């Protein structure tokens, strides 16, 4: 399969991705360097690397970080000349695509059998293992909503009402994993025809599309827009900083994806990559994930996350990950053709 669209996108983002390359860890001359591609939120990277280095101080993580869509496109563009040793914290649907392209190394991390089976690839041995679930949400600035006489939306369909015209921001799914899980979930919730009809109606109310899943919620928090379609993690973070936002879980249900880990086939640092994969499934790592995500892969240890909506787990749709992964490129091309005219410029 030729991923021409992914290659075109990657050409435009290589400079951005390069800017997201930085090292974290011990930094000693004897440390083995491990290039780790990720879409983990930037504010968590330092802490994640430090926790890993408590167990493996002789491995230095060199992060390459960007939004999910951009990281996925970069990996696909590098298929013939892989640069990443391992991916830690990318959408499971993206890793399924890489697996289908023969780009991942099958490996069951030590202790991986303790994870919730929904968070483990069905192949034996698996090509990826999950970490946590990130879920869609709507961030509403209550002050801006009141100033614009906007009722707090309670459903996805509410966002298509004329009263919200020009007051909604959401992520571009070609750049953002959150944007993609939104679009993929709407196509599942409303059916293929109904899903695109919903997106057509929503597009009429969109002020602009961002290239980050966090940005719509940040912009709602700062008052740049009354409503940002984002994800619950970022909503909780923004609310914790004192922003006047309400995190809405729409009544139809919410799309979600797993952050997951996969070793890249052909890595020259296989032993080090396996050590990182082993760490990612540990109880300690999952406690770390639970500091910001309410749903994690390791059963029985999750604690409530401050400012997270209470009904997240119940609202998560029955997501067909295989369908999402196999239809990813088709969905993204169609979305790009229909709606990209409102995307903000790439920075």
Enumerate the predicted regions with their spans.
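Extracytoplasmic ligand-binding site segments that recognize negatively charged/polar headgroups
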Residues: 39, 43-46, 69, 83-224
